[in-house]
């Protein structure tokens, strides 16, 4: 449980889901939010809002301590923010077109994905605020954490879509909900069917053959959480 593990680091004592729901919620909010550059004030406000759990009230100093702990515990994540921001800046200069970083390829104002699609930043340019681009009828500001969120969501979507295509060969894929795939099946052996589905969902893509994938599931006559 990564939420409890990080909460244990923050509170300097063992935290578990059953006995420490408030502390674990702090860990969950940190893991889900701080990975994309959320700062102390936004973290404090998110905890107080209690949208995903019980409202928790931190001082700004306490919130900053959690942010600092996250960034020092997972040093590779801030490094990724900087790397992806630099990669997006490369899209502004044609001498960089074709540069590759992992599954991403640099092109004009966009980062090309391994499935042939791309993250487009129309009219990307520098401003006094930093990197900005045109989005519909407004100008959007972007930075390392937000670019990282764009990339992670896009790559994750490719992975789950690949799983859907594999599963659709044997079953009827009805819909998806976030990272869930819901299928209908007439197979009379639901346990074996579920085992096969989980196996198919854990097949890594060729462009990230060492990515650690895992899945779990269940079955019923109707969809429920």
Regions from the language model: what does each represent?
Residues 1-225:
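Conserved catalytic core of nucleotide polymerization and phosphodiester-bond processing enzymes
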């Amino acid at each position: 449980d990564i939420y409890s593990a990080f909460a244990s680091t923050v509170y300097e004592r063992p935290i578990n889901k059953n006995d420490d729901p408030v502390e674990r919620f702090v860990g969950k909010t940190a893991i889900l939010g701080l990975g994309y550059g959320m700062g102390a004030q936004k973290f404090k406000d998110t905890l107080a809002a209690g949208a995903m759990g019980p409202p928790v009230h931190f001082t700004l100093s306490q919130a900053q301590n959690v942010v600092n702990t996250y960034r020092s515990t997972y040093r590779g994540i801030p490094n990724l923010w900087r790397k992806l921001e630099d990669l997006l800046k490369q899209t502004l200069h044609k001498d960089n077109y074709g540069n590759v970083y992992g599954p991403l390829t640099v092109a004009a104002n966009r980062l090309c994905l391994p499935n042939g699609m791309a993250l487009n930043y129309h009219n990307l340019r520098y401003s006094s605020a930093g990197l900005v681009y045109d989005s519909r009828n407004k100008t959007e500001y972007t930075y390392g954490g937000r670019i990282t969120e764009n990339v992670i969501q896009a790559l994750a979507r490719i992975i789950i879509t690949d799983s859907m295509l594999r599963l659709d060969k044997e079953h009827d894929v009805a819909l998806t909900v976030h990272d869930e795939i819901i299928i209908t099946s007439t197979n009379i052996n639901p346990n074996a069917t579920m085992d096969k589905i989980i196996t198919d969902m854990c097949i890594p893509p060729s462009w990230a053959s060492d990515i650690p994938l895992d899945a779990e599931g269940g079955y019923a006559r109707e969809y429920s959480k």
